[in-house]
Amino acid sequence: MTDIESLCRLTEAVEAAGADIAPTYLEYVQLSFAIATDCGEAGRDFFHRLCRVSPKYQREHAERVFSNALHTQRGEVHLGTAFHLAEATGVSILSLIHI
């Protein structure tokens, strides 16, 4: 399974649960780096889909945060961080891993 396929499945599970997996600014930034590092530009829409459940979501701000993550490329944060954030909010990821 590719990183994009994994991210797609994670996004669908998070949306189905209605979970805010990045409620703090730190988690929000970590999520942007995790997706940007492993999925690049192809992850941008997924980042928006994962963030828009938050009452604090602002599309323009999310665009800037993700663009910054793409350009900065901090390689120490990977897609596993997104799965960890989802799991921490109660989203079941076991079925996603074994598919």
Predicted regions and their residues:
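Modules that initiate DNA replication and primer synthesis
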Residues: 1-96
